[in-house]
Structure formats: structure tokens, C-alpha cells
Amino acid sequence: MKKIVATGTFDILHPGHIYYLEESKKLGDELWVIVAREKNVVHKPRPIVSEDQRLKMIQSLKCVDHAVLGDQTDMYKPIREIDPAVITIGFNQKWSEEKLRADLAERNICADVVRISEYTGMPFTSSTKIIDEAVRRRTK
């Protein structure tokens, strides 16, 4: 069975997230999703939605076979435990594919890295865009 791992914050679930996960699932037989812990989200504003609620939403998606919270101290721990063939990253995730591949190899994790393209089928395909629009509409 070919396992795929997708990772993300998934704050304010939107069509871009669904696209990312559905495209990730197409790469294998079993999709595992690692949902970022609140304390580990340091590259952008803290999530609005709690990690438990974000996990529950991801677990409810048809394309997701398993969803777990990330480890609070070692982001590679769940990846080692899942042992995926492929790790997907979203089009706007800050990872460099080359750096991630090197980090995985350094830890003896044999997984390919695939960046999923951007979904452009709808206007609100990022949490930031949704938040900005909500603020704009409510402060008129």
C-alpha cells in the first residue's frame, strides 16, 4: 500500500485545502494528513481555529484516510511512524523541495517530495484571503 503524507495548518478550511488533499490522495492508496500544532505555526499568524477542531475537520473529509496532529517537538516523528512513499506540500507552503529532501535523507526517511499546484477554481482559496475579506466586509 502506497502511503501519502500531506501536511498543513488547515486554518479555516477552504476549496484550496480540499484540492491539495484530493490531489495528494491521487498519488497513492492511503492519505495521511499531519495537522500542524498551534505552537509550531511560527511562519505566519497563529491559527484562528484550534488544533483539535482543525484535526476533526480534516478527519471528516472523504479523501482523508488518517489524520493526526503533528508532534510538538519533532516534526519528523510522525513521518517516521507513518513511513510514507510520498510527502506532498502545497503550492504556497514555505518549504523548499530540495531542502526537505535533504532533511529527510539526513534522517534516513525515504520519501519522495511532490509540490501540489495551486487551485484556481474559486476566489477564496486561502485562509488569509478569507480573513481579509471577512474583515473588509465587517468594517464597512
From Swiss-Prot:
Signal peptide (UniProt feature, chain positions): none
Catalytically driven reaction(s): FMN + ATP + H(+) = FAD + diphosphate
Pathway as given in its UniProt record: Cofactor biosynthesis; FAD biosynthesis; FAD from FMN: step 1/1
Presence of keyword Membrane: no
Residue sites binding ATP per the record: 9-10, 14-17, 92, 119
Keywords noted in UniProt: ATP-binding, FAD, Flavoprotein, FMN, Nucleotide-binding, Nucleotidyltransferase, Transferase
Cofactor: a divalent metal cation
A GO biological process held by the record: FMN metabolic process
Record-linked InterPro entries: Archaeal_FAD_synthase (IPR050385), Cyt_trans-like (IPR004821), FAD_synth_RibL (IPR024902), Rossmann-like_a/b/a_fold (IPR014729)
EC number: 2.7.7.2
Gene Ontology molecular function terms on file: ATP binding; FMN adenylyltransferase activity
Enzyme class: transferase
Gene3D superfamilies: HUPs
Free-text function comment from the UniProt entry: Catalyzes the transfer of the AMP portion of ATP to flavin mononucleotide (FMN) to produce flavin adenine dinucleotide (FAD) coenzyme.
Complex and partners: Homodimer.
UniProt similarity note: Belongs to the archaeal FAD synthase family.
PANTHER family: FAD SYNTHASE
Protein name: FAD synthase
Organism encoding this protein: Methanocorpusculum labreanum (strain ATCC 43576 / DSM 4855 / Z)
